[in-house]
UniProtKB/Swiss-Prot annotation:
Keywords for this protein: Glycoprotein, Glycosyltransferase, Golgi apparatus, Membrane, Signal-anchor, Transferase, Transmembrane, Transmembrane helix
Function: Does not possess sialyltransferase-like activity in vitro.
CDD domains linked to this entry: GT29
GO cellular component terms, semicolon-separated: Golgi membrane
Protein name in the entry: Sialyltransferase-like protein 2
EC number: 2.4.-.-
Bilayer topology term: Single-pass type II membrane protein
Keyword Transmembrane helix: yes
Sequence ranges on the Cytoplasmic membrane side: 1-6
Pfam families: Glyco_transf_29
Membrane-spanning intervals of the chain: 7-23
Location within or outside the cell: Golgi apparatus membrane
InterPro entries cross-referenced by the UniProt entry: Glyco_trans_29 (IPR001675), GT29-like_sf (IPR038578)
Length: 396
């Protein structure tokens, strides 16, 4: 090194030392980064988050079904033989062959009381209004926005917050558990898909504050009971117990209208249709954990996940959505009947043993485990600004 370059180099070195010293003092004064600033970074694997946030073919399909019903559905009712009841038909135009003109195809058929329903035109208008609200919610969520913001609104939907909540799953592991009194001691008890409690009280309790169902349950109730039972007999825990329902098929919104039309003051039909944002949030969480489990178990790229799961039908379980709802309305959440063991029935109240392929139960178990042990690691809930995951306990 030539001597004439030495002084400038020393000057630069001195400035670097002074700058480093100043930065250290500044860091001491400011302290470490706050948790709020660090929480702005999305939780979880970025690629899996991006893939999970894609609503996929299933969402597109249900939107297309709702739009087609809104535009083309017709409703007709006819008296039965002897005029004991009326037959209701929901129909859609359908081309039975490529060259044939479309003809009405029956989508749903119900037997209803003679005088319980409004005229066909008014009933169709009400059905279209329900479909319109359903489509609007889905389209708003499709345009982006923070779907996790729904977590701050859930308490308002139920009218209040609750201190302790029990979400009672339907797993056969509850049989012989003796958890009934422990479940009933909670302020809010959520049960799934109208599972029976009679005969199982010692293990599952009897108290029910909210019934959470998928719309297939309501459809079955309406098909069986609309003719004979007020409000379709779809509130087995009592008419005062509200039902929260997520929509599997848009046509099931007609069942809700029918059951509401046959309700009476002594047999009301309190129904809450889940917010489209809650549906989207649950779908993303379920898909994220399923993607993560697939990558971990197979070593394959996440893009290959569709080889194992058909996106058109993949869906979170009713229990998982009930758990997410409880997170938004409860200060403490306890889960019962969400595990499985060798030889245990799939449902404690039926003889079913096989799990449904459209759900990834193992991935959902991973989600519940994170809620209990690592709540800050749950993706997408971190997008709900101002929301903190309450303590969660798994009792299986």
């Amino acid at each position: 090194m030539k001597r004439r370059h030495l002084p400038p180099v020393l000057v630069l070195l001195l400035l670097s030392i002074l700058s480093l010293s100043f930065r250290r003092r500044l860091l001491v004064l400011q302290g470490p980064p706050s948790s709020s600033s660090s929480s702005r970074h999305p939780v979880g694997d970025p690629l899996l988050r991006r893939l999970a946030a894609d609503d996929g073919a299933g969402s597109s399909q249900i939107l297309a079904e709702a739009a087609a019903l809104f535009a083309n559905a017709s409703i007709s009712t006819f008296p039965s033989l002897g005029n004991h009841h009326r037959l209701l038909y929901l129909r859609m135009p359908y081309a039975f062959s490529p060259r044939a003109p479309p003809r009405p195809k029956t989508v749903a058929r119900l037997r209803v009381p003679v005088d319980a329903l409004p005229p066909d035109g008014k009933l169709l208008a009400s059905f279209r209004a329900s479909l319109g609200s359903f489509l609007a919610g889905r389209r708003r969520r499709g345009r982006g926005g923070n779907v996790a913001g729904v977590m701050r609104d859930l308490a308002g939907v139920l009218g209040r917050r609750y201190r302790t909540c029990a979400v009672v799953g339907n797993s056969g592991v509850l049989l012989g558990s003796g958890r009934g009194p422990q479940i009933d001691a909670h302020d809010l008890v959520i049960r799934l898909n109208n599972a029976r409690v009679a005969g199982f009280a010692a293990d599952v309790g009897v108290k029910t504050s909210l019934s959470f169902v998928n719309s297939n349950i309501l459809h079955i109730c309406a098909a069986r009971n609309a003719i004979t039972r007020a409000a379709c007999g779809c509130h087995p825990y009592g008419g005062e117990v509200p039902m929260a329902m997520y929509v599997c098929q848009p046509a099931h919104l007609l069942d809700a209208l029918i059951c509401n039309a046959t309700a009476t003051p002594s047999s009301p039909f309190p129904l809450l249709v889940t917010d489209a944002r809650l549906d989207a949030l649950c779908a993303r969480i379920a898909k994220y954990y399923s993607l993560r489990r697939f990558v971990s178990a197979t070593g394959e790229p996440a893009a290959n996940w569709t080889r194992r799961h058909d996106e058109r039908y993949f869906h979170y379980s009713s229990g998982m959505q009930a758990v997410v709802m409880a997170l938004g309305v409860c200060d403490e959440v306890s889960l019962f009947g969400f595990g499985k063991s060798p030889g245990a029935k799939h449902h404690y109240h039926t003889n079913q043993k096989k799990e449904l392929d459209l759900h990834d139960y193992e991935a959902e178990y991973d989600f519940y485990g994170d809620l209990q042990a690592r709540p800050a690691a749950v993706p997408f809930l971190d997008d709900a600004h101002g929301f903190t995951v309450p303590p969660v306990r798994l009792h299986w």
